[in-house]
């Protein structure tokens, strides 16, 4: 009888150890999968940021709420007569944005100036035409347009896509001098279109130069241990810590960049109106507070305001003093 119970206990303990081992292995595989997924997200974001060719594209990837504001400011830039009340209202609504709008404007102007495009430059005529050393021109150089500027990837170069030829009147002089300088027409290539094009075989991913990084050494007296699903190994503390204390790269909380940070919890951003508006409208018989979006019953009316010698504003349920022009 005792032998049978011993055998049963041994079988039960073996089963428990087997289940625990499977659970630990499953958590380890899940942690590795999560880390790979985080790296993939980071690499994809890095590629998108590197490929951004305008400030608008960069903001759209990195800070979506500033991108919305930037689009609005571009839309409002043509409106010169914006009253001070409206301007103050908007500056309050956009107080949570990450970048200053004026700074973005300066950066955008600088970016546009450095884009790949035809630029006026000076070229040496003799070198351009491949003339011999005993022939030279006066003036020796002419102004033409050539492609120049920066591209957004290391594997491409700013190159011309269309060319025209312009004629310049110059003096051609040969040595030894046998006659007076001759006035001749010279045709010089003038770039009219430019584009960032690959200089060689294109790889699926652009080569990214990085500084050499020394792998982080584990100074813990014992090797890394497997941690529970909601925890990670911390090399500095030599123990398992909660993911909130030591999050994986790319998994940090970026909720402050989302729409609630820009407009508040009860509002959403209206790109057409270029301002924050309430998410849910109030029923027809209630008035909506413009700041906290709460619904309330209007106590004022046209009659009550007339008795106070004031003007009734139905949208805000407020009585306003008459403004009489002189």
Curated annotation (Swiss-Prot):
Localization per record: Secreted
Residues bearing glycans: 160, 190, 292
Primary site of residence: secreted
Membrane-spanning intervals of the chain: none
InterPro entries: CXCXC_repeat (IPR004153), Cystine-knot_cytokine (IPR029034), PD_growth_factor_CS (IPR023581), PDGF/VEGF_dom (IPR000072), PDGF/VEGF_growth_factor (IPR050507)
CDD domains in UniProt: PDGF
Single GO molecular function: chemoattractant activity
Covalent S-S links between cysteines: 116-158, 147-194, 151-196
Tissue and organ expression note: Highly expressed in the spleen, kidney, lung, tongue, ovary and mammary gland.
Description of post-translational modifications: Undergoes a complex proteolytic maturation which generates a variety of processed secreted forms with increased activity toward VEGFR-3 and VEGFR-2. VEGF-D first form an antiparallel homodimer linked by disulfide bonds before secretion. The fully processed VEGF-D is composed mostly of two VEGF homology domains (VHDs) bound by non-covalent interactions.
Alphabetical GO biological process terms: dopaminergic neuron differentiation; fibroblast proliferation; induction of positive chemotaxis; positive regulation of angiogenesis; positive regulation of cell division; positive regulation of cell population proliferation; positive regulation of interleukin-6 production; positive regulation of mast cell chemotaxis
Tagged with keyword Repeat: yes
Pro-sequence residue ranges: 22-93, 211-326
Sequence repeats: 227-242, 263-278, 282-298, 306-317
Function: Growth factor active in angiogenesis, lymphangiogenesis and endothelial cell growth, stimulating their proliferation and migration and also has effects on the permeability of blood vessels. May function in the formation of the venous and lymphatic vascular systems during embryogenesis, and also in the maintenance of differentiated lymphatic endothelium in adults. Binds and activates VEGFR-3 (Flt4) receptor.
Assigned protein family: Belongs to the PDGF/VEGF growth factor family.
Assembly behavior: Homodimer; non-covalent and antiparallel.
Misc. comment: Indolinones; MAE87, MAE106 and MAZ51 inhibit VEGF-D induced activation of VEGFR-3.
Name of protein: Vascular endothelial growth factor D
Organism: Rattus norvegicus
């Amino acid at each position: 009888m005792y032998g049978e119970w011993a055998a049963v206990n041994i079988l039960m303990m073996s089963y428990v150890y087997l289940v625990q081992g499977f659970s630990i292995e499953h958590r380890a595989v899940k942690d590795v999968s999560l880390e790979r997924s985080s790296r993939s997200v980071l690499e994809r974001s890095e590629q998108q940021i590197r490929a951004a060719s305008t400030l608008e594209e960069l903001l759209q990837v990195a800070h979506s709420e500033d991108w919305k504001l930037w689009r609005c400011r571009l839309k409002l830039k043509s409106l010169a007569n914006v009253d001070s009340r409206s301007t103050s209202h908007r500056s309050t609504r956009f107080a949570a944005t990450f970048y200053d709008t004026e700074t973005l404007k300066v950066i955008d102007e600088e970016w546009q100036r450095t884009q790949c495009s035809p630029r006026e430059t000076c070229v040496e005529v003799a070198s351009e035409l491949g003339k011999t050393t005993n022939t030279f021109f006066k003036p020796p150089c002419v102004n033409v347009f050539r492609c120049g500027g920066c591209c957004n990837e290391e594997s491409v170069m700013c190159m011309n896509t269309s060319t025209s030829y312009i004629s310049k009147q110059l003096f051609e002089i040969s040595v030894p001098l046998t006659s007076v300088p001759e006035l001749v027409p010279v045709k010089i290539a003038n770039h009219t279109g430019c584009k960032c094009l690959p200089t060689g075989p294109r790889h699926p991913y652009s080569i990214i130069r990085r500084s050499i990084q020394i792998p982080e050494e584990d100074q813990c007296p014992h090797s890394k241990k497997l941690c529970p699903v909601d925890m990670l190994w911390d090399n500095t503390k030599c123990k398992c810590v909660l993911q909130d204390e030591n999050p994986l790269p790319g998994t940090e909380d970026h909720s402050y960049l989302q729409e609630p940070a820009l407009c508040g919890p009860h509002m959403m951003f209206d790109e057409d109106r270029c301002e924050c508006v309430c998410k849910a409208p109030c029923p027809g018989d209630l008035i909506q507070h413009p700041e906290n979006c709460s619904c309330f019953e209007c106590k004022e009316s046209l009659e009550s305001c007339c008795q106070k010698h004031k003007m009734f504003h139905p949208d805000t349920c407020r009585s306003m003093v008459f403004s009489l022009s002189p």
